[in-house]
From Swiss-Prot:
Belongs to the SIMIBI class G3E GTPase family. UreG subfamily. This is Urease accessory protein UreG. The gene is ureG. One of its GO terms (biological process) is urea catabolic process. PANTHER family: UREASE ACCESSORY PROTEIN G. It comes from Yersinia enterocolitica.
Length: 221
C-alpha cells in the first residue's frame, strides 16, 4: 500500500492510475466512472500529458452527461508524465488541491499518468493508493519483467484480455507469473469493451481504497 501523506489539507481519497502508453488507463477510467457514480461515489479526474490535454478531452467526450466536464482536468506536464507524479508531483498536487477546493463534496480523485514501461509509481505525497495497468498486447512475458509499478501497485490490472488469441498470449501463464512476482497483492483481468472484470475492479476500489461495504455480485443496484 502506498504510504499516506501527512498533508492535513487532504480531504479526498486519491488514487493513481498508471501504466505504459496504450495499456488502456483512460479506458479503465471511462468504464469505472459511471459504476462508481451509480454506487454513490462523487469522483474527480486528473489526466497527465506532456504538451496536450488530449486525454482529458477524450474523457470529457466519453463521460458527457455522466460527469460534469469541470470535474475533469488535464495537466500539461512539459516533461515525462511519470516525473510529474513521482519525482516532482508539485504540479499534480496543486491540481488536486484546486479540485478539492472547487468540489469539496467529492470523495475520490483519480490521477491518470503514463510512464516508462514498468517503472512508474506514484509519490505518496500525491496518491494514497495506485493501480497499475498493463495489457495483453504487450506480450505474455510482461509480468515476468517485474518493474516497480507492476510489483508494488495496490492493484494490478491486466487489460485487453480479448486480444490474447491474436498475440499468442496465454492468460493462464500471465496469471501464474503475476502471482509469482506480486505474491498476495491483488490483480484482475479486464476487457473494457465487454465489461469483463470491471464490476470486480470497482468492488476492489470500493472495499480496499474507499473502505466501503461491497455487496455480493449480482446485488448492485
Amino acid at each position: 500500500m502506498n504510504s499516506h501523506s501527512t498533508d492535513k489539507r487532504k480531504k479526498i481519497t486519491r488514487i493513481g492510475i498508471g501504466g505504459p502508453v496504450g495499456s488502456g488507463k483512460t479506458a479503465i477510467i471511462e468504464v469505472i466512472t459511471p459504476i462508481l457514480i451509480k454506487r454513490g461515489i462523487k469522483p474527480l479526474i486528473i489526466t497527465n500529458d506532456i504538451v496536450t490535454t488530449e486525454d482529458a478531452k477524450q474523457v470529457k467526450r466519453t463521460l458527457k452527461g455522466i460527469l460534469d466536464e469541470e470535474k475533469i482536468l488535464g495537466v500539461e506536464t512539459g516533461a515525462c508524465p511519470h516525473t510529474a507524479v513521482r519525482e516532482d508531483p508539485s504540479m499534480n498536487i496543486a491540481a488536486v488541491e484546486e479540485m478539492e477546493e472547487r468540489f469539496p463534496d467529492s470523495n475520490l480523485i483519480m490521477i491518470e499518468s503514463g510512464g516508462d514501461n514498468l517503472t512508474l509509481t506514484f509519490s505518496p505525497a500525491l496518491a494514497d493508493f495506485y493501480i497499475y495497468v498493463i495489457d495483453v498486447a504487450e506480450g505474455e512475458k510482461i509480468p515476468r519483467k517485474n518493474g516497480p509499478g507492476l510489483v508494488q501497485a495496490d492493484i494490478l490490472v491486466i487489460n485487453k484480455i480479448d486480444l490474447a488469441p491474436y498475440v499468442g498470449a496465454s492468460l493462464d501463464v500471465m496469471e501464474s507469473d503475476t502471482k509469482v512476482v506480486r505474491g498476495e497483492r491483488p490483480y484482475i483481468l479486464t476487457n473494457c469493451k465487454t465489461g469483463q472484470g470491471i464490476e470486480e475492479l470497482v468492488d476492489m476500489i470500493m472495499r480496499d481504497f474507499l473502505f466501503t461495504h461491497v455487496q455480493p455480485q449480482g446485488e448492485h443496484a
